[in-house]
Amino acid sequence: MLDLKFIREHPGTVKHAIAVKGVNLDLDELLRIDRELVELRQRVEALQTERNANAKLVPKATPEERPHLIQKGKDLAEDIKALEPQLRAHEDQLRQLLLRVPNIPHPSVPVGQDDSENVELRREGQLPEFAFPPLDHVELLERQGWSDPERVARVSGSRSYLLKGDAVLLEMAVLMFALDFLRGRGLTPLSTTALVRPETLVGSGHFPGGEDQVYKIEGDELMLAGTAEVPVNSLYAGEQLSYEELPLAFAAISAAFRSEAGSAGRDVRGLIRVHEFRKVEQYVMTRADEAEALRWFGAILENAEGLLRALELPYRVVQNCTGDMGAGKVLMYDIETWVPSEGKYRETHSCSYLGDWQARRTGLRYRDEHGKLVYAHTLNNTGIATPRILVPLLENHQQADGTIRVPEALRPYLGGREVLGVPVRAAAAEAKSPRNK
């Protein structure tokens, strides 16, 4: 949510953000309701002032004047009461429209309609060169007996998954490694629930507009969040922190749930797009200093890149265009990791800076060095998400016999093992393990 004063003073800037982000919002309607609300409040305040002045006259009035003044006070009270429904309706309308106002993108953000217009910034790591026909992650899991897609589909339907044996240990190793890695970078580990109240999804910016992506608990006012960003963003809702308490930086682990509405037919097979997953999320609350916030943006981006380098996975960083960055984002970079079976990079991380857009929604403020109450700034980035990260991990580290080479960083979490699985296919005499170009 943007400052209403800023919207009034910079309607052209806000309209441009609405246009380039593809937001369905009539800013002129918002400004009209705002003007009408100002007028209504002025009328109510004028009536209240008149009523208060009238009330002061009653004790001093003569017996002849008093009945008239008392009646006038009642009439003024009725006039005020008659305006209250209009006042509340305008306040509600304005609030709902303000929640849809997008943030202003950073000047560096490219203008575009969708992810096809994102801009690649850099590539890291060398793509694997296999001396054998590589398998995709589904085949690798099935040949090792690490999955059971048919049975789990009968239990949970499409976009569900089940891991067995060493695949479970690998998933847990990745999550624990990510937590340890981020803790070493100064983030506080946090384990949080995925169950949240609807207002937390408003606070994070997922509502209004993303309702079809969220699972609801019938018979209860609770929903299942798709990221730990949602509950962590509301942990300090309505609070006033001190200058010294910020920044707060968390590595939050939780289950995550997404309905994947609008994804029919996309990534149905395998682990790329599932309804339930586990995720370690980086989340930062910092002071209202854009330079400081952008330093944090660089830090949590580097954290994610450091994790991928430690997992020995090739990746690229792209800057999201205006049409692919979400309403609340000032700046957003995606990290995409190489998936050999698809011959392309797939998104595994999203790094975002939101200014005070979320803090205004939750009421998170702090006292600056001058004692003034100001809204905090927030940032977030994926630490690691499973099982999606297992896709590039399995495929990039597969060996000719179908076993998986364990990256050195994960070996302490797997009892020192260097290889997972057993040989499940004959390797050609000349075949070698993946080697780097």
UniProtKB/Swiss-Prot annotation:
Q: Which family does it belong to?
A: Belongs to the class-II aminoacyl-tRNA synthetase family. Type-1 seryl-tRNA synthetase subfamily.
User: Which NCBIfam families does this entry report, sorted A to Z?
Assistant: serS (TIGR00414)
* Residues reported to bind L-serine: T227, A228, E229, E281, T382
E.C. designation(s): 6.1.1.11
- Record-level Gene Ontology MF annotations: ATP binding; serine-tRNA ligase activity
What this protein catalyses is: tRNA(Ser) + L-serine + ATP = L-seryl-tRNA(Ser) + AMP + diphosphate + H(+); tRNA(Sec) + L-serine + ATP = L-seryl-tRNA(Sec) + AMP + diphosphate + H(+)
Q: Would you tell me the protein name for this molecule?
A: Serine--tRNA ligase
Free-text note on domains in this protein's UniProt record:
Consists of two distinct domains, a catalytic core and a N-terminal extension that is involved in tRNA binding.
User: What biological process terms from GO does the record include?
Assistant: selenocysteine biosynthetic process; seryl-tRNA aminoacylation
For whether the record's keyword set contains Metal-binding, the answer is: no
- The enzyme class is ligase
Function, please?
A: Catalyzes the attachment of serine to tRNA(Ser). Is also able to aminoacylate tRNA(Sec) with serine, to form the misacylated tRNA L-seryl-tRNA(Sec), which will be further converted into selenocysteinyl-tRNA(Sec).
Q: Where does ATP bind?
A: R258, S259, E260, V274, E347, T348, H349, S350
Name the pathway it acts in.
Aminoacyl-tRNA biosynthesis; selenocysteinyl-tRNA(Sec) biosynthesis; L-seryl-tRNA(Sec) from L-serine and tRNA(Sec): step 1/1
User: Where is this gene product found?
Assistant: Cytoplasm
Record bears the keyword Cytoplasm: yes
Q: What PANTHER family does this protein's entry cite?
A: SERINE--TRNA LIGASE, SERYL-TRNA SYNTHETASE
* Quaternary structure note: Homodimer. The tRNA molecule binds across the dimer.
Keywords, ordered alphabetically: Aminoacyl-tRNA synthetase, ATP-binding, Cytoplasm, Ligase, Nucleotide-binding, Protein biosynthesis
- Report the Pfam families cross-referenced here: Seryl_tRNA_N, tRNA-synt_2b
